[in-house]
Structures are given as structure tokens and as C-alpha cells.
Design a protein with these regions (language model features):
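Conserved mid-core segment of classical short-chain dehydrogenase/reductases
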Residues: 51-150, 167, 183, 189-190, ...
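Phosphate-coordination loops involved in phosphoryl transfer and adenosine-cofactor binding
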Residues: 7-10, 172, 252
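Canonical Rossmann dinucleotide-binding motif of NAD(H)/NADP(H)-dependent dehydrogenases/reductases
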Residues: 3-47
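C-terminal helical subdomain
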Residues: 104-108, 156, 222, 240-276, ...
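Aromatic pocket-lining residues of Rossmann-like dinucleotide-binding sites
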Residues: 30, 212, 268
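Catalytic loop of short-chain dehydrogenase/reductase
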Residues: 15-24, 42, 130-215, 224-230, ...
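A glycine/serine/threonine-rich, flexible loop-to-helix segment
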Residues: 50, 54, 192, 215, ...
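Hydrophobic structural elements of the Rossmann-like NAD(P)H-binding subdomain
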Residues: 13, 126, 176-178, 220-223, ...
Length: 296
């Protein structure tokens, strides 16, 4: 039987802080396929997330198909706005939400993994990171600072992670990021430079696939997922309207589930996808294929 088999693999999923988003669903799918999973979580949300896990508040979401319970090998602090500890402003490093976490940068996360597991330490890296501080603003009203912040965290951080984790990933490793159709089409309401960030993310994926493939033999892909009513997506402000629009116009009118994206990510990280790199895979019930409204 042909199956996704990730036994013996270790994955890092960056950008998980609750049980409602794509990152959590991907982490769960990877565990279901046999991988061990470490998480990178935004420092201000880390304590709350660990408390939810420890107190059993999200136990229903942790249930696995085989009757077991989802467990993470490690949960590390990560703020993908910073490439190295030197990039973290002093006032941020000394703030209440950061001061007890040490080096929260991408390089700091890489160092923690090496300290815990040696080199090489991972097989799979998932980038489920995005932040647009001005996402509710139209592009015409977006500041330079807000625009660059969106691109830095949502797109450049993928290049930074591939650069830093590429040497720490076993040959034939897989990198996967998450994008959205606003990279290709105009989506009113998805502002603050986030559409530009997603376009950059998809463009970078193609070049990273070439560079990481030639340098280390790794594959680099991105999933363009449909809208999901996650806690993170609520920041957009029009997410429910976007979901309703997709259900009305997509070839498959059912609402997209996070688990469907998780399954595709697990496939892309597996040997079954060994010939796929530099690709943008749409998981959106076919909405991306449409050029007009339904006839009836």
C-alpha cells in the first residue's frame, strides 16, 4: 500500500500558537505520518499555548487517528522578525514577554536545535509565519514601515530559515511555506502589504528551490491555501466574508478545513513528492481556477 511514511524524520513547524490554524494542522499531520515534531512559537503567545496544553484545554484537538495523543518533542520561542540575537532591540529583549526566553531569533532557534539534537538535526522545516501590522489598511494608506514589516516577517523569514536550517537539514530535506491567492490576484481587504509579501514568498520559493536544491539537495515548496477562520486570520477583518465568497464560487463549495492543508503538506514533505520543488500548490477547493461566477 502506498502511504505517507515519515517515520524517523524530525520536523520543525514554525508559527504555531494554538490549535486552530494551518500550522497546527500540519504539525498534527506530520505526527500522524510518523514524524517527531518541534514547534517554534511567538514568545508573547508561548506561555498561553503551553498552559493550554498542560491543562488539557485543547485535548480534543490532540487526538490522533490511532487513538494516541499528539505530543511535541520541543516547543521553542521564535520571533521571525529577527535573524540573529543582535537584531533584537534592547527594549524588546528586556520586555516582560521576551526577557525569560533568551535568544528568540531564527539563528537562536537553529542553535537550540543543534544543542538538543546535534547536526544534522531536522528533515523537514515548515514556515507558517505571517504578520502584517497594517493588514486592515488599503495599500494606498499603508506606511513604508508597515509594508516592510509585512514583507520581512511573512516572506524574507522563509529565505532566512532556509539559509540557516539548510546546513542543519539531512540531505533530501523538505521546506514548505504557506501562501494565499492574494499573491496572484487582487483581494480587497487583504492590505498592509500582505499581498506583496505573499507574492514575494512565492517568487522566493522558486529561487530558493534552485539554490537549496543545488547546494544541499533540499526541496522548497509553498502551499497557497484558501481562507480559514483561524484566530490569526481574524486580524484581517473580512475573513468570514472571504470564506463565504469561496463557498459560493469554488468548484468544490464545501468550506476548507485545516486538516486538508495538513495532508498536502505531509505529502510534500514525504518521499512521495521527491520530484516536486519550486512549486506553488493550491489547496483552496479549486477557487484559483475560476475566472467568473457560477452560471447558476
Amino acid at each position: 500500500m502506498l502511504r505517507i511514511d515519515l517515520r524517523g524524520k524530525r520536523a520543525l513547524v514554525a508559527g504555531v500558537a494554538d490549535d486552530a490554524g494551518f500550522g497546527f494542522a500540519i504539525a498534527k499531520a506530520l505526527v500522524e505520518a510518523g514524524a517527531s515534531v518541534c514547534l517554534g512559537t511567538w514568545p508573547p503567545a508561548l506561555g498561553i499555548f503551553k498552559t493550554l496544553l498542560e491543562r488539557g484545554k485543547i485535548d480534543a484537538s490532540l487526538a490522533l487517528a490511532d487513538g494516541g495523543k499528539l505530543a511535541f518533542e520541543r516547543i521553542y520561542p521564535l520571533d521571525a522578525e529577527f535573524d540573529s540575537e543582535d537584531d533584537v532591540p534592547k527594549d524588546v529583549a528586556e520586555s516582560k514577554r521576551y526577557r525569560d526566553h533568551g535568544d528568540v531569533s531564527i539563528a537562536g532557534l537553529a542553535a537550540r536545535l543543534v544543542a538538543d539534537f546535534g547536526e544534522p538535526c531536522v528533515d523537514i522545516v515548515v514556515h507558517s509565519l505571517a504578520n502584517g501590522p497594517e493588514v486592515k489598511k488599503p495599500l494606498l494608506e499603508t506606511s513604508r514601515r508597515g509594508y516592510l514589516a509585512a514583507v520581512g516577517v511573512s516572506a524574507y523569514s522563509y529565505a532566512s530559515m532556509v539559509a540557516r536550517f539548510g546546513p542543519l537539514t539531512r540531505p533530501g530535506g523538505a521546506f514548505v511555506a504557506l501562501s494565499y491567492l492574494a499573491a496572484e490576484r487582487a483581494v480587497p481587504g487583504y492590505g498592509g502589504g500582505m499581498s506583496s509579501a505573499k507574492a514575494a514568498l512565492e517568487s522566493d520559493t522558486r529561487l530558493l528551490a534552485y539554490e537549496a536544491g543545488r547546494k544541499w539537495g533540499h526541496r522548497v515548496n509553498v502551499i497557497s491555501a484558501g481562507p480559514l477562520a483561524s484566530r490569526a486570520a481574524s486580524a484581517i477583518g473580512v475573513i468570514e466574508r472571504m470564506i463565504a465568497h469561496y463557498k459560493q464560487h469554488a468548484p468544490l463549495p464545501e468550506e476548507l478545513s485545516a486538516a486538508e492543508v495538513g495532508s498536502v503538506a505531509a505529502f510534500l514533505c514525504s518521499p512521495l513528492a521527491s520530484g516536486i520543488t519550486g512549486a506553488t500548490i493550491h489547496v483552496d477547493k479549486g477557487y484559483h481556477a475560476m475566472g467568473g461566477p457560477p452560471v447558476s
